[in-house]
UniProtKB/Swiss-Prot annotation:
Belongs to the 5'-3' exonuclease family. XRN2/RAT1 subfamily. It is an enzyme of class 3 (hydrolase). GO terms for molecular function: 5'-3' RNA exonuclease activity; RNA binding; rRNA binding. This is 5'-3' exoribonuclease 2. Residues 504-530 have a biased composition (Polar residues). Its EC number is 3.1.13.-. It is found in: Nucleus. It comes from the Eukaryota. One of its GO terms (cellular component) is Las1 complex. Keywords: Exonuclease, Hydrolase, mRNA processing, Nuclease, Nucleus, rRNA processing, Transcription, Transcription regulation, Transcription termination. Possesses 5'->3' exoribonuclease activity. Required for the processing of nuclear mRNA and rRNA precursors. May promote the termination of transcription by RNA polymerase II. Essential for vegetative cell growth and chromosome segregation. Residues 488-503 have a biased composition (Basic and acidic residues). Its main location: nucleus.
Length: 1010
């Protein structure tokens, strides 16, 4: 989900990042839909190497489509998944790798959000079901009354009718789309079949390698994709010009695409803003979101040109800082800062503060996923000076929104009332119209039910204010009710009738206890509380008045006045720790499976005033097992997705963990306009307490249930006669289309055309998907059945696949060998962006930085003394390839190899000793000595001519992976290492794999110093 509004914000600010998808129309033959595209034909959208499918983004709309009837069975839902996935594949047509990633167990930081969504979903479903039941009963009652039938009593007939409604099959529970459920097991089996079916029937798939990471593999789908991309970049034979595409709906995929630092990257998604204009069941159109063009916009928008700025502009690190700034506006793991909202222009405000900070700072805020906390503190300190102004503006905007909604609702209610009066032939006097307060309580003796409150809250609270007379009457009757000793009615609308107390903020607190209080309850007699008549939302904090910090923590965190100062710093430190966790998650993978932010609300920007010296450390931890996550995120109403042995723990009153499964819970609008944005105030789970009771039930599980609770690795499926299979035969894993070796085989990207990693025959217990025959696994009607394939005709083969583990920390840089295309933005468009920046800041710019003719002068200004100088061709800021020869032969632009490397000479977290580069202390550079990647002298594995040709030239020519003296050149980012000395190819990959490998796997003098 990420940042609501981010896609719209970027598509409006950077319009060229969005482009239409060319999609061939399908045809109907004998009632069957035939794709109009030929997968083997050239792709009209441009050729693509690797496609990554975040499968949850496909499964959800296929199982419970918006505005349409859901398929009647799970098996037919999976057929819809096949159909939709094929549509995506025919648009993208990847030629090398397809990765299908399903959400596995998530980090604890994400589980809290999943828990809130699933509890809210179950509650809404229950309310909807109750509303439907009552509506049908009411209709039946009217029918019987009008028919005047005799025989059974009206009460008896209605009881029988109600029982029939209760016994009707319920709506499919979308909470089944969670790891560990029978549905997810069925989904994985179905995808394995479908991939095998396509390999057997689609000629264009013959050389495609398909990696499936199902729900038994830990991690969120999009982050498993990120791990895969990082692992391939780390392979020494990786092609830096590989093109990538992710299909998915979440806005945070934009951040993930940027964080790869793979410029040939785009996203495929549905055009959600055009879908309402499509009639009936027409397919929603696809659009591309082009990350490479977004990088062009960011290059112009983020460039700092203040004359006091001494830091060289580096697009890659500027992008990382921009991603960091956006985390305060929203992400999947932390609540956004109160003053940060995309729709209010918060990203622009933060960027301006960042540019101002660059005049004071010595470096960027982030470095390869690590945060400079002192500079982060300085940034937020200056942002805090604008916080109150932004919050007041948000409040004014919300009030205007409420007024417009009130007018709209009043008109709609008046229309409904008029229609009802005509139908019933009755006249309703205003004096007899029941009036309700915002809690749903009648001023008289009528009390709304929970269902009526939630289902009709807008109609009730807004229609009562349809005209001034009604409003006056409401105020009078509310006051009269208060005077007679009735319970104070002017409390904000809430979803429960008997609210529970918010639990302790500690992540390992004791189980929560009940508390009759509720956030933001309002008292009309309190002059210090503002109550909005249209929604009943009580503004206790009142950001427009002084002292709002204390009120914020006292009302949102239930702190006492003398506790506020310590609490706000505690919350700020935990929040910043969370931001660091998220950044590391994006750039290096999950740093802790157990950490989570233990509060429902974010701190204020002014509270980050003592974070510069805080320690950010995460202890080792392991992911939950699937049933442990299910017990953490599912409400009791969805307990049918779990084995029967666990269900009493969720529903029985004497369960030791029953407090984790409340049926009623608080919703806090927290100043938001729409109810779906409300904060869901659920108790945080004590992991040790939960796991103690869940794991005690493991001995009662059946073998099938235990199997669903097992964690596994990815698999790769490929064609028996394709190029990948031929590579496996050359390496001895296969013979004549049959797997003959049980030993793991390590493969690099070059020999497999883009799929580095370790493959091996699956364990016997896990080999159901790799049997020679391929059987259609779904139970559907005959006309929907797909073919099965006997062993002698099945061309699909399956191996266990292990993603390579990086031996070094991922770096935020373009890889050597990348050839940038011509700019998409014209000179005029780039100038317009710069003019917009000048107008926003009112400052002067060095026009030399934007010269479109003197590229050499521009590069000298941007690159001198920075690690960009060592990347040469990989620079996005360079002219088209035909004009780049001047850089190769210019020793000045090659950089000061002794002193100018990547963060050398005491930069961010560095040690000055010995010119060692990023966090290195000796001369050896990044993890290596003089001998290249993990080698002392011999290179990647040969004694011959070198992967790049020419004896001793190494992988990239010159003397190593990055040319010159290493990955970054000289003593910097590579020191004499990561490509230095003899280079990634050293004596040469081409000289015979494994031949003359002299260096072993230890490296030389440098050593890995983190």
């Amino acid at each position: 989900m990420g940042v609501p509004g981010l896609y719209r914000h970027l598509s409006q600010k950077c319009p060229k990042i969005v482009s239409d998808v060319i999609e061939d129309e399908t045809t109907i033959v004998d009632g069957e839909e035939i794709p109009g595209s030929d997968y083997s034909a050239p792709n009209p959208n441009g050729e693509l190497d690797n496609l990554y499918l975040d499968m949850n983004g496909i499964v959800h709309p296929c199982t419970h489509p918006e505005g349409e009837e859901a398929p009647p069975s799970e098996d037919e839902m999976l057929l819809a998944v096949f159909k939709y996935t094929e549509r995506v594949l025919n648009v993208c047509r990847p030629r090398k790798v397809l990765m299908m990633a399903i959400d596995g167990v998530a980090p604890r930081a994400k589980m809290n959000q999943q828990r809130a969504r699933r509890f809210r979903s179950a509650k809404d479903a229950a309310i909807e079901a109750e509303s439907t039941l009552e509506s049908e009963l009411k209709a039946k009652t009217i029918e019987l009354q009008s028919s005047g039938e005799k025989g059974k009593s009206l009460e008896t007939i209605l009881d029988e009718f109600k029982q029939g409604l209760v016994n009707k099959p319920g709506k499919w529970d979308s909470n089944a789309i969670t790891p560990g459920t029978p549905f997810m097991e069925k989904l994985a089996a179905a995808l394995r079949y479908w991939v095998g079916y396509k390999l057997n029937t689609e000629p264009g798939w013959r050389d495609l390698k398909v990696v499936i990471s199902d729900a038994t593999v830990p991690g969120e789908g999009e982050h498993k994709i990120m791990e895969f991309i990082r692992s391939q970049r780390g392979d020494p034979t990786y092609n830096a010009n590989t093109s990538h595409c992710i299909y998915g709906l979440d806005a945070d995929l934009i951040f993930l695409g940027l964080a790869t630092h793979e410029p040939k990257f785009k996203l495929l998604r549905e055009d959600v803003f055009r879908q309402n204009k499509t009639a009936g069941h027409q397919k929603k159109p696809f659009i591309w979101l082009n990350i490479d063009i977004l990088r062009e916009y960011l290059r112009e928008d983020l460039r700092f040109t203040h004359p006091q700025t001494k830091i060289p502009f580096d697009l890659e690190r500027a992008i990382d800082d921009w991603v960091f700034l956006c985390f305060f506006v929203g992400n999947d793991f932390l609540p956004h800062l109160p003053a940060c909202d995309v729709r209010d222009g918060s990203i622009n405000v933060l960027v301006n503060q960042w540019k101002n900070g660059m005049t004071r700072w010595k470096d960027y805020i982030t470095c390869d996923g690590h945060v400079n906390l002192a500079q982060a503190q300085d940034l937020l300190k200056n942002f805090a000076t604008q916080e109150q102004r932004i919050l007041v503006h948000q409040e004014q905007d919300r009030v205007e929104y409420e007024k417009s909604q009130a007018n709209k609702a009043a008109k709609q209610q008046a229309h409904r009332d008029s229609k009802k009066l005509r139908q019933q032939g009755e006249q309703a006097a205003l004096e007899s119209m029941p009036l309700y307060d915002t809690k749903g309580e009648s001023v008289g003796d009528v009390q709304l039910t929970n269902r009526e409150l939630v289902g009709q809250r807008n109609d009730i609270t807004l229609a009562n204010l349809a005209n001034q007379d009604a409003a006056d009457k409401l105020r009078f009757m509310l006051k009269r009710g208060s005077d007679t000793g009735a319970e104070e009615p002017a409390k904000r609308a809430k979803i429960e009738e008997e609210p529970k107390e918010a639990e302790s903020n500690s992540s390992e607190a004791t189980p929560p206890t009940a508390n009759p209080s509720i956030a933001n309850d309002a008292d009309l007699s309190n002059p210090n509380v503002t109550v909005h008549e249209t929604t009943g939302y009580a503004d206790h904090v009142q950001f427009h008045k002084s002292g709002y910090t204390e009120r914020y923590y006292m009302n949102k965190f239930h702190a006492k006045e003398d506790e506020v100062d310590n609490l706000r710093r505690q919350v700020a430190e935990e929040y910043m720790k969370g931001v660091c966790w998220v950044l590391m998650y994006y750039y290096h993978g999950c740093q802790s499976w157990s950490w989570f932010y233990p509060y429902h609300y974010a701190p204020l920007a002014g509270d980050f005033d003592q974070i510069s010296n805080m320690k950010v450390e995460f202890g080792e931890s392991a992911p939950f097992r699937p049933y442990e996550q299910l017990m953490s995120v599912l409400p009791a109403a969805s307990g049918h997705n779990l084995p029967a042995v666990f269900r009493p723990l969720m529903s029985e009153e004497n369960s030791p963990i029953i407090d984790y499964y409340p049926e009623n819970f608080q919703l806090d609008l927290n100043g938001k306009k729409q109810e779906w944005k409300a904060v869901v105030l659920l108790p945080f789970i004590n992991a040790d307490h939960l796991l103690e009771h869940v794991q005690a039930k493991y001995t009662e599980l059946t073998p099938e249930e235990k199997d669903r609770n097992t964690l596994r690795e990815e698999i790769v499926i490929f064609h028996r006669l394709g190029k990948y299979a031929k590579t496996l035969e050359k390496r001895g894993l296969m013979e004549k289309g049959v797997i003959v070796s049980k030993k793991p085989l390590v493969l690099n990207s070059h020999e497999t055309s883009g799929l580095a990693g370790t493959v091996e025959r699956q364990n016997e217990a896990d080999r159901t998907s790799s049997k020679p025959h391929l059987t259609f696994p779904l139970n559907v009607s005959t006309d929907q059945t797909m073919p099965s394939f006997e062993a002698d005709k099945n061309m699909a083969m399956t191996l266990e696949y292990k993603i390579p583990k990086l031996e070094y920390e991922n770096k935020s840089m373009l890889l050597q060998g990348y050839i940038p295309p011509k700019y998409t933005l014209s000179d005029e468009e780039r100038e317009a962006i710069r003019n917009r920046e000048r107008q926003r800041r009112g400052g002067q710019q060095d026009s030399r930085l934007f010269s479109n003719t003197d590229h050499r002068q521009q590069q000298e200004l941007l690159m001198n003394g920075s690690y960009l100088a060592f990347k040469k061709l990989s620079l996005r800021d360079q002219p088209p390839p035909a004009k780049e020869d001047w850089m190769l032969n210019d020793p000045k632009l090659a950089g000061d190899r002794g002193n100018g490397g990547y963060n050398n000479r005491g930069g961010f977290n560095n040690h000055r000793g010995g010119r060692g580069g990023f966090n290195n202390r000796g001369r050896g550079g990044f993890n290596h000595g003089g001998g290249g990647f993990n080698n002392s002298r011999g290179g990647y594995g040969g004694g011959g001519g070198g992967y790049g040709g020419g004896g001793g030239q190494g992988y990239g020519g010159g003397q190593g992976y990055g040319g010159g003296q290493g990955y970054g050149g000289g003593q910097g980012y590579g020191g004499g290492g990561y490509g230095g000395g003899q280079g990634y190819g050293g004596g040469g990959y081409g000289g015979g794999y494994g031949g003359g490998h002299r260096g072993g796997h230890r490296g030389g003098r440098g050593g890995h110093r983190y």
